[in-house]
């Protein structure tokens, strides 16, 4: 069954006997100062099909990125991670939380199927601009551009 899920998307699948040791699991999310602004980058990339680990990392990091003192621009890096409906719903629930008002959200490393899942999950729930950009540098530019997040 897993083979069928990943047959067209091998970059999001990795057979690993110790998934908790994957570099994506250990990669830290962080605030990046950029062009006079700040962006929170939530690194969920390189975690392949280990959705439980992705959601656990997201929940752990959410205690930080939902703080009022953290940037209201956020980028979710999802390269080389299998994005499931459960993960999309978890991200949508967190970024639509009333405790934090995000201005701009960018999803980096998504294909058209994943983009459609995010659009459906955020429909009538989002109070912010969001975009899908596969280039990290372009995503940074979009997140800090004045016209995007006003």
Regions found by a protein language model. Give the residues of each.
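Amphipathic, Lys/Arg-enriched alpha-helical "gate/interface" segment within cytosolic domains
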Residues: 2-150
